[in-house]
């Protein structure tokens, strides 16, 4: 008789039912983490064109990649939450759900009659997560928000860029949106753990603004200590040197020395040991005070060889160093493949799940995002009110 190895569970949240009322990016990113980790996620979309991001490019055929990344593996149903029949289906979902996630502007769920207090009456174990631009409380609670607005109002744009340049959005990604999604996931996971002990649900209130402030870290600490907002410093580190982009003979690369020992090792390997004993550079506070002169001295030595040479020898000397890669080069790194961070979903490549948990599969292929109302008929039947059944 041939023994078969039992299949691994889908993820630690296998069996969890998530009702997903979120749209665009900050909420869907949080619920996608739950989905990747095994939860069954039902995305409720409004009549018409559904989630706005279905109309966002880039496209592969008629498929929005923007929408696909943060909705892969979910089910879609169109419900009009002002229609009595659809409201009944929604409430039946709530009765059976573990988690409800929403990112409407504060007040919308109240007007629909679906705030936490009302839904907790029919499901006291419900974890109800709200993610908004500025939170459910405070003078800016009802202020409309997109990623760039939150970056501007959090101070991060004023702290980003070069001293002689304008305030700069953290580009290449929607940082504030993703902060909201990550902290929504953290709140949901924490509340689920607490529910195991208390048997009770909870209301989670997270915001893009709060998350971005938390990520500001050293900038807020600098202001707290000095009373002054930190100046823009380009690619340098606010407290350590050398910690910057440096020009080699052919192209730039990055060197990061977090202590005096690493700085001495760097000076030795690039053939400039005298820099380690130069009074301007002996200790970190000296190097910080003379950062411009330090960079000039290092780049003089680095100009003698191409970046590939320095990346090799500096790395072998134990000093943190790295190449400057574009997105295509990063995607093609063997490390990216080794970590399964480019996966196939719905026939297209996209970022994988960065959370690796022993005992659970991390599949290279995941289900794609649903078409609008793709599972609508089946879900209406599954969650029909008892009297309708």
Curated annotation (Swiss-Prot):
Its EC number is 2.8.3.19. The keyword Transferase applies. Pfam families: CoA_transf_3. The active site is at residue 237. It comes from the Bacteria. Keywords: Transferase. It catalyses: oxalate + acetyl-CoA = oxalyl-CoA + acetate. Belongs to the CoA-transferase III family. This is Acetyl-CoA:oxalate CoA-transferase. The lineage of its organism: Bacteria, Pseudomonadati, Pseudomonadota, Alphaproteobacteria, Acetobacterales.
């Amino acid at each position: 008789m041939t023994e078969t190895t039992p299949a691994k569970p889908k993820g630690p949240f296998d069996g969890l039912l998530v009702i997903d009322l979120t749209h665009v990016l900050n909420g869907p990113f949080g619920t996608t983490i739950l989905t990747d980790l095994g939860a069954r996620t039902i995305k409720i979309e409004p009549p018409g064109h559904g989630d706005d991001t279905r109309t966002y490019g880039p496209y592969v055929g008629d498929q929005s990649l923007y929408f696909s990344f943060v909705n892969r593996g979910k089910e879609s149903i169109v419900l009009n939450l002002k229609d009595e029949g659809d409201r009944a289906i929604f409430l039946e979902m709530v009765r059976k759900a573990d988690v409800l996630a929403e990112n409407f502007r504060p007040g919308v769920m109240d007007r629909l009659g679906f705030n936490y207090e009302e839904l907790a009456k029919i499901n006291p174990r419900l974890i109800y997560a709200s993610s908004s631009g500025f939170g459910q409380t405070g003078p800016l609670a009802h202020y409309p928000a997109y990623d760039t607005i939150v970056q501007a109002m959090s101070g991060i744009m004023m702290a980003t860029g070069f001293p002689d340049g304008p305030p700069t959005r953290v580009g290449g990604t929607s940082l504030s949106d993703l902060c909201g999604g990550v902290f929504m996931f953290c709140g949901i996971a924490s509340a689920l753990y607490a529910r195991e002990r208390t048997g009770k649900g909870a209301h989670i209130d997270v915001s893009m603004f709060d998350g971005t402030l938390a990520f500001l870290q050293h900038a807020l600490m600098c202001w707290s200590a000095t009373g002054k907002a930190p100046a823009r410093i380009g690619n340098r580190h606010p407290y350590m040197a050398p910690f910057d982009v440096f020009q080699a003979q052919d192209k730039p690369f990055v060197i990061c020395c977090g202590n005096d020992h690493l700085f001495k090792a760097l000076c030795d390997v690039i053939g400039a040991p005298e820099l380690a004993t130069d009074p301007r550079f002996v200790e970190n506070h000296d190097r910080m005070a003379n950062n411009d002169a330090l960079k000039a001295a290092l780049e003089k030595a680095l100009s003698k060889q191409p970046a590939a040479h320095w990346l090799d020898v500096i790395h072998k000397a134990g000093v943190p160093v790295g190449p400057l890669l574009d997105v295509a080069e990063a995607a093609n790194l063997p490390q990216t493949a080794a970590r399964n961070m480019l996966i196939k979903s719905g026939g297209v490549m996209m970022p994988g799940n960065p959370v690796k948990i022993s005992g659970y599969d991390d599949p290279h292929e995941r289900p794609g995002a649903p078409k609008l109302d793709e599972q609508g008929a089946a879900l209406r039947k599954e969650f029909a009110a008892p009297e309708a059944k």
